[in-house]
Regions:
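Gly/Pro-rich, tryptophan- and cysteine-flecked surface segments typical
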Residues: 1-208
Length: 208
């Protein structure tokens, strides 16, 4: 359902426009997602979520050419208890004109179902799928048969004022690149590799 809209935006060559949803749109609390429609195929962007003075994270916007066409992989889930107070939130959008019933298969064999109407957006935490209970035994998952669905996940730790996030994608590859690591001056780098298939695989990690 269309909640709000703003006037036409002109971007000059190499131009950039920042929009704060809460400032530029009416009824911002009712807005679940935004579509930027352009007469050019040379537009890119990103979304930034933040609480001033606490945490922030930036996640790329999704071009219509990269809408998922199959299973979506939830690469990492952090849902701990009081001693590990991480929360994982998932946001998904059905970009199609048909309703969808999505099954989420977790790595501990649990399954949950999420219903999406045509063009519907839903946001939920992993805990909310289990009655609000933390799920420290779940580390990853697969959203099955999710063609036409896009999404992202956010990780938060309120005690540490930490936030992170990634897109939910359907692509896999033989080789994956981690283009930057930092392990000095207090920086730490964590890398994650996830095998969503039912077959074992051998991974060779080569640092350069």
């Amino acid at each position: 359902v269309l909640v709000s809209e703003i006037d036409v935006i002109d971007l000059v060559p190499h131009g950039r426009r920042e929009i704060i949803v809460g400032d530029k749109f009416t009824s911002p609390a009712d807005i679940g997602y935004v579509i930027f429609e352009s007469n050019s195929d040379a537009v890119i962007g990103y979304t930034k979520f933040y609480v001033e003075g606490q945490y922030r994270v930036a996640i790329p916007a999704i071009p219509d050419s990269e809408i998922n066409t199959g299973d979506i992989y939830i690469l990492h889930i952090a849902s701990g208890g009081d001693t590990y107070p991480w929360h994982t939130g998932v946001s998904i959008l059905n970009t199609t004109s048909l309703p969808k019933t999505l099954t989420i298969e977790f790595d501990n064999s649990e399954t949950k179902t999420v219903e999406l109407l045509a063009n519907e957006h839903k946001a939920f935490t992993i805990r909310s799928l289990f009655g609000g209970a933390a799920q420290p035994g779940i580390e990853s998952g697969v959203i099955k048969d999710a063609s036409g669905v896009i999404g992202l996940e956010l990780f938060t730790n309120n005690d540490l004022n930490w936030m992170g996030g990634i897109l939910l994608k359907d692509d896999t590859a033989t080789n994956i690149y981690y283009p930057h690591t930092a392990s000095e001056d207090g920086w730490k780098t964590g890398i994650v590799a996830y095998n969503p298939s039912d077959i074992d695989c051998t991974i060779i990690i080569t640092p350069y």
